[in-house]
Amino acid sequence: MTKLSGSDTKSTLYCSFCGKSQHEVRKLIAGPTVFICDECVELCNDIIREETKAGIAGKKDGGVPTPRDIFETLNDYVIGQDRAKRVLSVAVHNHYKRLKHSGKGGDVELSKSNILLVGPTGSGKTLLAQTLAKTFDVPFTMADATTLTEAGYVGEDVENIILKLLQASDYNVEKAQHGIVYIDEIDKISRKAENPSITRDVSGEGVQQALLKLMEGTTASVPPQGGRKHPQQEFLQVDTTNILFICGGAFAGLEKIIADRLQKRSIGFGAHVADPDKRKVGELLQKAEPEDLLKFGLIPEFVGRLPVIATLNDLDIEALVKILKEPKNALVKQYAKLFELEDVTLTFTDDALEAIAKKAIERKTGARGLRSIVEGLLLDTMFDVPTESDIAEIVVDKDVVEGRKEPVRVLKGKEEAA
């Protein structure tokens, strides 16, 4: 298949689909007597993606995607973490299968299984929850546990979580009742001391107690305009029984609790005891048990409402490089698109991607830190490109990432190293 541009032929060529000329688009791809532009190719890809996404609901079990379907969808956006993706795929499949068959009666009542995601910062907890919501096309909201307090104290009431879910569903109560709620930083509401205190802990144990009812299923009275400023408004009644709650947290220090427990069990003649310091955090977190979460500061009832525990591993250099370039919304693709809008090609060399990944690991920010690193590298270039029309390509290599030089600017017709 041949790519044609304005310099390849004297006559003007047009896209056979949208009718734009070769001068209005970046690329024209030639076929037998027809041409298609890059914009139409992208549009076709979007249509196919939407149909695939819609088709996922038509799979077996009358509309509930299979765990394998969910796993494959998660693979498109989340790199690595296969074990966590499998656990989530099965748990979410069972949850929506339970909803589908809940109205059909029968002797056995299926209980809800909320999910706890445990993993280091920047390992993909939030992204997994967001991708699940997209897969099922259900209302989704995120809440930060650190802002929550018991009702009557300064801070956000737990009912505000359901209000956000209602807003995400355009105040459609029926739709909101089948949504997904992701509560981040759940480890920050652990009990401040291992033994109950006589002083009231309104942002720790108090919030856990307040979340209990929501998570197990209750009818929450939700003020549509927020509770404290409009006391006269009518309340909406939302049944939380069928809302899937996914809680996530880094649980810094949990690995030490697990290591202590494992070491105690390994004591004895001939017992093999691995040095806890030599194990990765993710390896230890995989061995997490409810008793470890209790020791960390979660109350027994709260741990009981989160029967499914999925642990995420630390991301290594190889995984971070894949995250940079492989997912559908990969960071490299996003920045390449930004430069493409200015008719400039952005190129990252393989050693540059490795250097960026190493920097993220040094900063201990995981995948979340990749964007700030790339943004810092390209800031001055993005400032100049819109006003300098003679730039054709920007090349980022290892030396650029390590601060030894500026990104290389390839000019139209000649090359110049900035």
Swiss-Prot record:
Entry-linked NCBIfam families: clpX (TIGR00382), PRK05342.1 (NF003745)
Protein name, as recorded: ATP-dependent Clp protease ATP-binding subunit ClpX
Taxonomic placement: Bacteria, Pseudomonadati, Pseudomonadota, Alphaproteobacteria, Sphingomonadales
Coiled coil: none
Binding positions for Zn(2+) per the UniProt entry: 15, 18, 37, 40
HAMAP family, per the entry: ClpX (MF_00175)
Gene it is expressed from: clpX
Primary role: ATP-dependent specificity component of the Clp protease. It directs the protease to specific substrates. Can perform chaperone functions in the absence of ClpP.
GO cellular component: HslUV protease complex
